[in-house]
Amino acid sequence: MKNAALLLAAAMLALAGCASAGDTAAASEAAPAESTAESAAAEDSTEAALPGEPHPLSAYSACAVSGSSVYTAVSHFSSSEDSLGNFDHSTVYKTDLTTGQTYEMYRTGSQLTSAPLIIDDTLYFICYDGGMLALPTTGGEARVLPFSYDDWMPVFYAGHYLYCRSVSAAPFCRTGGMRFNLENGETSPWNIPVETMYIPDVVGDALLLCRVVSDYPVPYPDDDEMSQALLQNTTLEYTLADPATGAVRQTCFTLPYDIPQPGSLTIYTYLGKCGSDFYFRADQCDDEYALVSQSVLRIGTDGTRTDLGITKTPDYLDYCAVLQGDEVRWLLTRGTDGIYLIYDTQGHEIGRNKRPAGLEAFFPLCMLDDGRLLMVVGYDWEHDSAARYAVMDADEFLNGGSAYREMTFAE
């Protein structure tokens, strides 16, 4: 695995703002179409060229993996009577998968995102109360850089720069971009189309960028009746865009961002990529907007769509992807009987497993470079309820086995 970022996706997406963006979009299917709308670019950035290869901020929400090390921040909430439930501190833990031990690296009074961005020998954690913690992995003094969590959503990094889009985004705001220097906290403008709704991934040297396409320019008006009418005629266009300039290189596919009648609502959630294919979970809702069924779509960069034919009822948990690095390897869901169903990227069932008796958790976070799984097998209540990690052979999991090597907390 590259020494890449595995940043808390949930924290990046749970931001307040006037955007209706995120990893989901209310939509019903439409055939791929070339956009006729012109994309307005933001102000020119200080430097057009990227300072290095672009890397995505991956969907692993609980931890960051670099080589044989796993890093995570865990929030501790007070259990004392006078401050019950109040945030108390965050602890950064490192797990060495070679030695099999987890130990405390750092403690702070700021609440941190769970998974850091890792560049070289430094961990970068966003602080919910403002700023960004830069923590060396090899020792040395921690620094706090100025960063506004309420205003900016990180989307990828290149070199020692973090590229962010504004939390206030299309279609009800004009989307802006910012380049953040991770060495000194300085900022500069970054080119991004003002119609950008969200940027779910990096594909090679391009961004997978979702933008609003409409005859009406953003921002849409606050008037509810007018905005609803506009949304019914708005298209969500997924493109491959230049990460430095925001210029569209290729239109891949489109989905209408409409306000459907009850019974015809489909909500798409981006799961990840594998090669030149993108994977979306499609949630079908009924007249009361309750979930009826869930399926997985594979959409190519040429717009070709394939329903993988693994539709499930609400009795199953949401489909999720098991990634190795930046690529989807498996699709996973679990029924009310507790049995995990595992599928390959073509939609073929390749295995089943069930949580062993006595374990409070048993699920794969990701696939490591060597093909083993990083598992969560429980939580340690004496260490801020931190996850108890284990490594497990992938074939063992696919074949329904339960043999794994658990990490232990160093005292």
Label the predicted regions.
Residues M1-L8:
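Positively charged n-region of N-terminal signal peptides that target proteins for export
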Residues A14-G17:
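C-terminal motif of bacterial Sec signal peptides marking the signal peptidase cleavage site
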Residues T254-T333, Y340:
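Eukaryotic tandem repeat interaction scaffolds
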Residues L57-S66, S110-D120, Y149-G159, P193-G204, ...:
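Repeated scaffold domains used in trafficking and secretory/extracellular systems
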Residues D44-H55, E81-R107, D129-F147, A170-P193, ...:
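Surface-exposed loop/turn elements that mediate protein-protein interactions on large endomembrane-trafficking
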Residues A19-G22:
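Bacterial signal peptide processing site
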Residues A31-S61, S66:
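N-terminal low-complexity, Pro/Thr/Ser-rich intrinsically disordered segments
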Residues C63-N86, L117-C127, H160-P171, D205-P219, ...:
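Short beta-strand elements that form the blades of beta-propeller/WD-repeat-like
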